[in-house]
């Protein structure tokens, strides 16, 4: 690796974050959607067609590398300035869910390059896709329920944890070689989609080679090492921590781009265990590398890529602790940077070492520093095992999004797909389905006498819950139109060529949320 002074990479990471926070426009997602409009329909197979549009997007998407980057890659092009709860224009009284999947086009400010006509053309195309038409039918059917949020549903993208471990160890070329002789559109789509990350790496390498021509010596040393790294990964497996982080970032970038715009809450999983096989340096150096890794997850002026989670610690099936040196290096990176994203979570159990608690103490007793979310790994083992999770998968329990426990690479819990609003249901029970806000009749239910309100409330809750389940399943069926051949490579599809049928899903249990 290139030589650097202690703290030099930390300073670069902080400067890189400052540059990211200065970004006020996010246009890459629009370019991705426009590319889909221009290139889709070439193949009869929807799976292969989606893989081709992903590859074409990677070929033309504008790329850049800052003088403060030591790793190339960004997830900026997958997100829009849209997420309600961190959007300054968000008003609670106007929220009724995410009913219009093309509303994201309101979040791009027209200018000379992205004209109103250009935006309108892509939006009109998207409105006529199978995905949007199916989803619009669902929202229209249940509009009276969601109008004032007796419940709301979401068309969930993201919200799971890919398993990149095989790719990190063996490289993408071996994955392509392992699937090229298998039959089926799914295999052809995954083979094509995997080529996207190679194309992306080559494009970044060309940028670095151009920057190298007139770079000062210190930066030239960094650029030469970065170029050398991209000659190795993602084609072949990582040999050390630097290569592993770089490869992970590129895989993540393509995965998010495949589900643009706004694949919220994709999460890393047990990062300490993912990177432990590649730990080839000291803790201080690893910390500075992971500081750059953490900056990667922050998008523009409000860190728009929300609820991406990294978890540390935990146990194996015998109860032995799995903490390692990478655990503490990542903790140090989190503490030093104190960034708004990604979320830090930790798994605790009866054999968690004292050193782990001591390292957490600096988060808990330093004012103004983020604090990790705590998860009882012993309890998670028992609960998920009782719900059908295989024992061999339990050490891979990780958190996707805010607090949703999933199995890395095997579990699409579809979390945040539906939210039941019990206070609103109570209101409608008391009023006989009439809104206290507008006076409008929202539901065909009778007004409950106060002396019998509990029984009627439970009956109405069951009524709305059943309707919510039907609506939520409708949203999931709509999302099934959005093929994800690249992501499927890291969710079990690589082994069998399966892109998952939403009508015949045999994964782990799903759940709903309450508000």
For the regions a language model picked out, list residue spans one by one.
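Alpha-helical bundle segments that constitute or directly flank the non-heme di-iron/ferroxidase center
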Residues: 195, 199-201
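Conserved catalytic cores of very large enzyme subunits
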Residues: 2-193, 218-515
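A conserved hydrophobic secondary-structure block that centers on an alpha-helix together
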Residues: 212-215
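Low-complexity, highly charged intrinsically disordered N-terminal segments
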Residues: 190, 201-204, 209
